[in-house]
Amino acid sequence: MEINKKNEIDVTENNPIIEKNKVPQSEMKSGLQEKKNLKAEGTKAENVKEVVRGKHKVLPCYDNRELSWLKFNERVLDEASDEDVPLCERLTFVSIFSTNLDEFYRVRVGSIYDQMIISDKKRENKTYMTSSEQLERIFKITKELLKKKEHIYNGLMKEVKNYGVQIVNFDKLSKEEKDGMENYFKNNVMPLLSPQVIGKKHPFPFLNNQEIYAVALLESKNNDKICIVPCRSSVFNRLVQIVPGSGRYMLIEELILHYMPMIFENYTVKSKSLIRITRNADIDIDEIFADEDISYRESMEEMIRMRTKLCPIRMEYSRVLDEKVIRSLCKELNLKKEQTFHQETPLDFDFVFKIQDMLRNRKELFFKRRIPQVSTAIDKTQPMIDQIEKKDILLSYPFESMTSFINLLKEAATDPNVASIKMTLYRVAKNSQVVEALIDAAENGKEVVVMVELRARFDEQNNIEWSRRMEDAGCRIIYGIDHTKVHSKICLISYKKDNQVKHITQVGTGNYNEKTSKLYTDLSLMTANEDIAKEVAEVFNKICLEQVVEETEHLLVSPKCMQSKIVELIDNEIEKIAEGKEGYIGFKCNSLTDKVIIKKLIEASNKGVKVDMVIRGISCLIAGVPGYTENITIKSIVGRYLEHSRIYIFGKEPLDKIYISSADLMTRNTVRRVEVAAPIYDEAIKKRIRGMFNIMLSDNVKGRRMKPNGKYCKDEITGEAINSQEYFFEEAYGEHKVEKYWMVNWFPDSFFFGSKVILWRFIFSFSVQSRLGRCPRHGVQYTYDCCRNYVSYERNIVSHVIYWRNLWYFACDYVSFEVNAVSHVI
């Protein structure tokens, strides 16, 4: 591994990890040879089975978007069964799987269901399935995945039991425990319940989205009745401790369900279960905006209220229910039997985070703590603007800290030479330092223009509140373009220097969100390139005029000039093959659904262009299909961090073109949103991105390769195991300057540095106390104070302020000791 003059790491040259896992040259076909082989074999392999739906022939290299997403969510679930993942983190993956599935049903299944109601004749454009055909497959696969989740969850809870925490059912309790639970229910739960028997004078109630309800079939003298009891998460603690001080818990909904006979004491309970409703979230915003008497922001608030009232799309239940109850619930909720899902696991997994809190002191049950590092490209003693003027800077999250970009904004907010800051915001943190910096800039007299996308799904309320605060501070807030979301991540800082107007431009792949920057992998480019600044300024100007950019020279900007330029760049690689040269395409993105780009990639593959793609989620293109995509490889990486960066590579070095982008290769991104992809002109950064891409392709721990049948499997580890995310963090920790405390550097790195501080101060304390001739209890008291300071210190490990404050305390302690020593002598 070499470090070049610009302190960028070359991870491709002489890298033993890549060399060990690299495919032998003899096994690799050149683009030209692949082209000859394809001609010899014909354009279609005889063993490829063709499918016809309606009047359409389905190519075997296409996959349905929704079914591909379900495969992705299964890969998330597979992480929960990976024994190399710490136990509590495996519980997290079960929770993520369930949350993902909830959102999938709310958004995607809800949309497909709406389409089916309008017309079931329309077919999607890749596998030509109708809406009803898609729903049938989705429901079938969902039930299979729920069984798999149940098996994994039960296994995990058996392991959790070994660490002293257990979730138990009522029938597993002892008599004393049952008596205690009955008293708890009577005194703490029953007075807060709102039970209801359904009848003519008591109509079926509105069931809130994703709330748990206890339902039962009651036998009465005249006829059977259905009753419902809300198990409100806002009222009750989800986990009820069975015996104070024990690690045995019961879910509140299970406790309520058990005591249904007590709640409805005048009836006989024939059957009972817990249910949970998922409501559609697919809403036509344009219908709300038709009211011209209210503002855009008020329209969005109205949409949020309306979304909670949309029709149910799914019902889950936890016990075998009487068919009469299921039919009645389906009728009231306007659901079909296929939209009901039985599962024995809890219906909501938010409680796993409370279990994790109970086990937080067991470090082996969690991922090793990782802290984003300051990039080696940045000198913390120099202004950010001055550094970016000298060279482009690339930040790689979460391995490198977002603090450097925030410092750039804070610097711009107070710099008297800065005239304006323009920025797009899609999803921001609840306590956003980014927005606070923009507010400070406006209050300091800068022109601050912020494009806030209020239509960021499920983040609308947060964006509405921040837009109000920024507006009150003097920022100019705009809300984008009708029918076109602004999803680009761009920031433009304009300032005067040497009687000239200059610019600093930032283009990123992810949101300006401090929280997700520690959880998602993203790239952020900061540059003083005036060509890029000019086109980013044009993007902002067009948005302000409710228009879109029609033509660019450097950037790729959707909806008008991204898809067409990507196709043009792919054509360039095809032309290289015709000229006898090597063609190459590399893509990293979250999803691939754009059929125009997919068809062009199939063409490139058939011409002999080598195509490597790292696609975390949906891929409507199946790799390795004979006669179609033989020269295409697709790998999905699902690990500790959510893969989120987008990279486009065209050609081999040194003539390659590399872009980082906010856009996935999805039709919604390339033709229905404002997205920006920025070219990388700095050679050191290009080399770094190529190296990162190659490491991801070599990932044989968290990477899963797509097979020609559309399924995914992990590569067999023949050389060294490569976890790309761990590799990048080790690189950040090893090659970058990890901040340590000078006073404890001589201790082994295996010691946690906080422990080193305690030990050092413990020794120092007793040595000084002995010198002063004091009794040992003073040393013990001082050690206790050291420990207390350490706890405070540990909570603020990232804060430089606390770091320097503790050093100051330490210095004061030392001075105090010296004064006491002098006093003792006197």
Where are these regions (language model features)?
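Ala/Thr-enriched low-complexity intrinsically disordered regions
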Residues: T12, A40-A45, S765-S767, T783, ...
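Cysteine-centered motifs
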Residues: C775, C786-C787, C812
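Short, strongly patterned local motifs
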Residues: M743-V744, F752-P776, E818
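N-terminal localization/anchoring segments of enzymes in phospholipid and broader phosphate metabolism
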Residues: E2-I585, E603, K607, G617-V744
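Short linear/disordered segments characteristic of secreted peptide precursors
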Residues: P16, F751, F764-F766, S770, ...
